[in-house]
């Protein structure tokens, strides 16, 4: 895998961020402030008239202090890296083989044309075509997706040569033909017509819900559609593996469709199970040393992305224990100020450079180049699979369409194949959490593998972001449940991870494992001081009390550092403001309900299902609201009841506080400041409650229930504030 070098031997460099020293100094002062705050809380409990209120505030501040510590662990040694792919020089036959795994599960939430564009964009990489094998896992077992990929295989014979001969940069056909800068040559226009014809056929099939005989009568794969009988369902069906295109001429990549066997009586382990099936099938067919995992909506935006990854994976100084190279998730179509914080800048950019200065970033689930060897035990101890001849170091030299190869591939994709094996525990992607990406990355790090964050100037991948608040919240409820599954298991990062990793790396992983815990201080600080303010009671120090300034300093210091993080990593003030607002929204919705769902699941009172986030944006009115930066609350949903209740409570407290200024004298100033800050953040909610009449407004039922709950909370304050 080691290349020849042009000029300098360095394929990559790294340098520490300039903010490191100031952040370390600030961490010392902020820690002193937190210690002082804890002392104040303990002193208050001893002398408190109402122990319950003081204990709730103490609990909230303990959670805030812990989460600040986890964030600070990622601020102490952030680094930035630069790759030089132009220095990577190797003959085509010397490039390492590359297997690409693309996962999809529902042709209606993840349109087949989206899958097609993702597959074509990576098949067209600036990389020796015969070295690329693209495996598409269809966990929904849909004939619609298979038909779309059959069409893609035909179109690729024209699209790939066009891209490479004309140095096309946008290698997703949909993106290229939608751009104003695409070529107007006859060849390009003919290709566009071919693409539109393919697109219309695929969309017609999806709309009708079945593959009509007229579309496949002359196709060599037409007989495979006979498998879709009345007994065939997405949860119960046989294995289907189709080699739609293979590189026998060394001019085109392999394209393989894989739908693993499903049975209602056998656990399938969601996406982790699908990826492990692809690991085994690819080991049988191609066994490439490098694996790229992609979600079906993350198309390639940079044709040289594999070369950026090879700058690290081919470096003999670091590749012995280099498990994976993680690229950031970037999203297309995000509105100017990112009202839903869809870019997830803190987890995908800011925190990641902090992880990179330790043992490397967490696995983000997509856009990741793996060393295949990393899935088979620690760097120093190879754990062979049950079929030893198909270990990570074997050279696959048989034709992938050979009958014995296809038969074995079908066998390893069976629903009972993993029984009594190490798959999911010691080999492959790990089971036990809905967030298989986070958990797998954590286990690889604990085994001694390192990772690297690679963020080229030209984004490697672009995906689709939710355009409706319901989709944003729903997606993160699932994340919250999965993260808590790790936090409350034997693999808790703080107990299990501290020995093989380090204190800072363990705290970094804790930042995500305990992510849903943000809901505790947000609920307490969103309701308790406001109820107190309405009743004219102080729960914080008054303005004349020296402790008053400790709260002010900690609040302003924390927010100033958060803003600094954002601006230094290329963000804007408006995006930061929307990000911190969405932190509150998530805390009072997705984190709150995720915490609740996990608790019910632990008590066997609820079963969490895996729901695919819709990536289809066909609602024109919804898109229009998104582009105008108007919050879209979508259909009626109880997910918005807590945040609406908190919004009403803060508005009532704010109005009561303004009136009280003239009657209370010194009064509860901190409570009024907190309510004022919350009211400013809740302006889109008030607008959706009262001023709007479109379909994206808050439903009247939610507003009524929130008002009723606010009345109950305010009334109850009369009793517990005594």
From Swiss-Prot:
Check the record and name the Gene3D superfamilies matching this protein. Answer: Spore Coat Polysaccharide Biosynthesis Protein SpsA, Chain A
Q: What cellular-component terms does GO give this entry?
A: Golgi membrane
Give the GO biological process terms: cell wall organization; cellulose biosynthetic process
Q: What SUPFAM superfamilies does the annotation carry?
A: Nucleotide-diphospho-sugar transferases
In the Enzyme Commission scheme, what number(s) does this protein have? 2.4.1.-
Enumerate the GO terms in the molecular function aspect.
cellulose synthase (UDP-forming) activity
Q: Active site located where?
A: 139, 437
Where would you find this protein in the cell? Golgi apparatus membrane
Q: Which UniProt keywords apply?
A: Cell wall biogenesis/degradation, Glycosyltransferase, Golgi apparatus, Membrane, Transferase, Transmembrane, Transmembrane helix
Q: In which tissues is it expressed?
A: Expressed in young seedlings, primarily in the vascular tissue.
PANTHER family of this UniProt entry? Answer: X-BOX TRANSCRIPTION FACTOR-RELATED
Q: What does this protein do?
A: Thought to be a Golgi-localized beta-glycan synthase that polymerize the backbones of noncellulosic polysaccharides (hemicelluloses) of plant cell wall.
**Family the UniProt entry places it in:** Belongs to the glycosyltransferase 2 family. Plant cellulose synthase-like G subfamily.
Q: What is the official name of this protein in its record?
A: Cellulose synthase-like protein G2
The top of its lineage is:
Eukaryota, Viridiplantae, Streptophyta, Embryophyta, Tracheophyta
């Amino acid at each position: 895998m080691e290349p020849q070098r042009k000029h300098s031997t360095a394929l990559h460099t790294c340098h520490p961020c300039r903010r490191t020293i100031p952040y370390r100094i600030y961490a010392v002062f902020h820690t002193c402030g937190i210690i002082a705050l804890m002392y104040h809380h303990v002193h208050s409990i001893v002398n408190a008239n109402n122990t319950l209120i003081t204990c709730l505030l103490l609990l909230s501040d303990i959670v805030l202090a812990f989460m600040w510590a986890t964030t600070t662990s990622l601020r102490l040694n952030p680094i930035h890296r630069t790759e030089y792919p132009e220095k990577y020089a190797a003959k085509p036959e010397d490039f390492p083989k590359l297997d690409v795994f693309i996962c999809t599960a529902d042709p209606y939430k993840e349109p087949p044309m989206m899958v097609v564009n993702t597959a074509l964009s990576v098949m067209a990489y600036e990389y020796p075509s015969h070295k690329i094998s693209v495996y598409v896992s269809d966990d929904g077992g849909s004939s619609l997706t298979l038909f779309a990929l059959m069409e893609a295989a035909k179109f690729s014979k024209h699209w790939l040569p066009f891209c490479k001969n004309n140095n096309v940069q946008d290698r997703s056909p949909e993106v290229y033909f939608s751009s104003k800068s695409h070529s107007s040559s006859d060849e390009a226009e003919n290709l566009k017509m071919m693409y539109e014809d393919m697109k219309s056929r695929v969309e017609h099939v999806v709309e009708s819900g079945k593959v009509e005989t007229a579309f496949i009568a002359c196709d060599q794969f037409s007989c495979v559609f006979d498998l879709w009988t009345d007994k065939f369902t997405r949860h119960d069906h046989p294995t289907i593996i189709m080699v739609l295109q293979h590189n026998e001429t060394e001019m085109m990549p392999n394209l393989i469709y894989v739908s693993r066997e499903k049975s209602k009586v056998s656990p399938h382990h969601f996406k982790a199970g699908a990826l492990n099936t692809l690991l085994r099938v690819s080991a049988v067919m191609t066994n490439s040393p490098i694996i790229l995992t992609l979600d079906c909506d993350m198309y390639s935006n940079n044709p040289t992305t594999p070369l950026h990854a090879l700058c690290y994976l081919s470096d003999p100084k670091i590749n012995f224990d280099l498990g994976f190279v993680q690229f950031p998730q970037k999203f297309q179509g995000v509105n100017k100020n990112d009202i839903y914080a869809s870019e997830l800048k803190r987890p995908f950019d800011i925190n990641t450079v902090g992880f990179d200065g330790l043992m490397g970033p967490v696995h983000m689930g997509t856009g990741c180049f793996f060393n295949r060897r990393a899935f088979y035990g620690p760097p120093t101890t190879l754990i062979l699979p049950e079929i030893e001849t198909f270990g990570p170091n074997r050279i696959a030299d048989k034709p992938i369409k050979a009958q014995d190869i296809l038969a074995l591939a079908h066998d390893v994709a069976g629903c009972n194949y993993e029984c009594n094996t190490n798959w999911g525990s010691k080999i492959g992607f790990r089971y036990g959490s809905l967030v298989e990406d986070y958990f797998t990355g954590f286990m690889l790090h604990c085994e001694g593998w390192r990772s690297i964050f690679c963020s080229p100037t030209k984004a490697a991948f672009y995906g689709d972001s939710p355009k409706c608040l319901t989709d944003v919240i729903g997606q993160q409820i699932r994340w919250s449940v999965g993260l808590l599954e790790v936090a409350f298991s034997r693999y808790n990062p703080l107990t299990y991870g501290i020995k093989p990793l380090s204190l800072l790396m363990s705290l970094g992983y804790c930042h995500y494992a305990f992510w849903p815990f943000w809901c505790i201080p947000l609920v307490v600080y969103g309701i308790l001081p406001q109820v107190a303010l309405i009743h004219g009671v102080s729960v914080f120090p008054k303005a004349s009390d020296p402790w008053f300034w400790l709260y002010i300093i900690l609040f302003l210091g924390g927010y100033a550092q958060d803003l600094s993080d954002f601006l230094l990593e290329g963000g804007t003030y408006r995006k930061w403001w929307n990000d911190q607002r969405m932190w509150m929204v998530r805390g009072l919705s997705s984190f709150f309900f995720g915490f609740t769902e996990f608790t019910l699941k632990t008590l066997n009172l609820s079963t969490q299902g895996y729901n695919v986030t819709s990536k289809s944006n066909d609602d024109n009115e919804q898109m229009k609201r998104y582009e105008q930066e108007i919050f879209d609350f979508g259909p009626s949903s109880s997910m918005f009841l807590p945040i609406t209740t908190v919004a009403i409570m803060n508005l009532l407290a704010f109005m009561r506080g303004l009136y009280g200024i003239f009657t209370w004298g010194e009064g509860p100033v901190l409570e009024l400041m907190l309510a004022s800050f919350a009211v400013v953040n809740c302006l889109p909610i008030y607008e959706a409650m009262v001023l709007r009449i479109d379909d994206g407004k808050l439903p009247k039922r939610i507003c009524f229930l929130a008002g009723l709950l606010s009345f109950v909370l305010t009334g109850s304050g009369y009793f517990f504030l005594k």
